[in-house]
Amino acid sequence: MYKSLLLSINVLCVSIVWAQSPAQSKLSVHWEELTAADFRDAIARAQATCLLPFGILEKHGLHLPLGNDLLNVRYVALNAAQQEYAVVFPEYYFGQIFEAKHQPGTVAYSRGLELELLQETTDEMARNGCKKIIIVNGHGGNNSLLPYFAQSQLETPRDYVVYVLGIMRGGPGEPKHKSDPATDMHAGESETSLSMIARPDLVHLDRAPQESGADQARLKGLPEGLYTGIWWYARFPNHYAGEGAAATRELGEFEAKTWVNGIVQAIRAVKADKESLRLQNEFYERSKHPLETPQ
């Protein structure tokens, strides 16, 4: 009887330990929710692949929250990481948004700080085992900043790779839009539809028609291909582009699924990528002695 009881206790203990082991227990994809020990296991499970969802704080018409880009990009990134495991960095909103400084609630960090903070962040992520970092962009104002940042990684040797994944919307099977896609650029039909899925509690659809999101085209005299920083303000001074009132949950579900699937595919591709770091290292070595590079 005693031996039988002891055996049962031993089996129970082993079962508990096995159930709590990293391989069997559910590891959160949220960096900030992991314990120090679990974080180590999470990095191993993620194959050193981490996501940095990148948002911003800016006006989104009269009907969406200031952090809409951050909320949406984190929604899709977290859902993707749960399908293809990756560690997701906490809220990050230190990007380019000078064009919205005239609107309340906008937080626009200086250009030097934006790049310095992003570099420090990816360096620290890498020091903690994230050797493959996918910056998931959720803000159109970062479309030039982030590729430049990725390119600048060639300035100094690093033991990790930065990848940049852009905003992914639209595609085959997309529901028909009610508004003009050409001006559906900010807090309009598409973005508002996605927000109805990510954070429906923060969408005030009834307020959308109270402000114009029309293109004012105040620089139409300039030729195509000629760039000036005031272009966005010249077209959309209300910092609203499109028709948010046209949003639907049907379109939002399509947008969310498309973006999540795109991130999942990117995570899988990055996990399998062995060439980028090898080529980086080759480039760093050759850069030390450019005169020795075969011509």
Where are these regions (language model features)?
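Bacterial N-terminal signal peptides
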Residues: 4-17
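Extended, histidine- and acidic-residue-enriched regions that form the cofactor-binding/catalytic faces
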Residues: 20-112, 116-132, 140-295
